[in-house]
Amino acid sequence: NQRSSGTQACIEVCPTQALRLMDDKGLQQIKVARQRKTAAGKASSDAQPSRSAALLPVNSRKGADKISASERKNHFGEIYCGLDPQQATYESDRCVYCAEKANCNWHCPLHNAIPDYIRLVQEGKIIEAAELCHQTSSLPEICGRVCPQDRLCEGACTLKDHSGAVTIGNLERYITDTALAMGWRPDVSKVVPRSEKVAVIGAGPAGLGCADILARAGVQVDVFDRHPEIGGML
């Protein structure tokens, strides 16, 4: 991707400043300089241990706090606490915004706008971040908890093998939990009602997600389940 400044996006955002564009003239100059060093007996290794030692001046991953085993054994609730505002800011600040269409975005089955909503968290715009999450995901508050991020978006994070992947799932959970607690609800004011009616059998995540997509399209939806509560395996 090319930025408005005329440079390539990868060059601008490279955390180690290891990339630069070279033309034929520049490559020839490097070649001649190396030949002269070799002729003078001053040839040196291209290895840069100092570069690897200083790789990525980004804070290490912390993630969400985990409830102790002594407490977990007494219930079947969630074992990870949600991020607080300070933790969310810490994790969002770690994102290097490696590209407009970053690896995390491509590896997400829903192609969520991950770098964009992380930037909104960084700016404190939680409602806007929730709106963005909901544009591509029917259940972002659920996906933030149970989606296997370690082999999808977080598994593709640029920082994974260095300071640890950004905790994308925890940030998604933080966004939606916080927005819902603030009273936010998805905006359905622009939905145009249609005459079609659909019955969805099963009130698990798949059924609820299906009903959400249909409802956004204006279809009248009824969800049925044999259990008294929605959620299925959740």
Name each model feature, range by range.
Residues 219-232:
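Glycine-rich FAD pyrophosphate-binding loop
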Residues 1-197:
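Ferredoxin-type iron-sulfur electron-transfer modules and their immediate structural context
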Residues 117, 205, 232-233:
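Gly/Ser/Thr-rich helix-start
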Residues 138, 204-205, 229:
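Residue-level detector of alpha-helix initiation sites
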Residues 11, 211, 231:
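Short glycine-/small-residue-rich flexible loop motifs, especially phosphate/cofactor-binding loops
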Residues 152, 209, 232:
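Conserved SAM/SAH-binding loop-helix junction
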Residues 32-33, 212, 233-234:
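Short acidic, glycine/serine/threonine-rich loops at helix termini
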Residues 197-222:
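N-terminal Rossmann-like FAD-binding beta1-loop-alpha1 element of flavoenzymes
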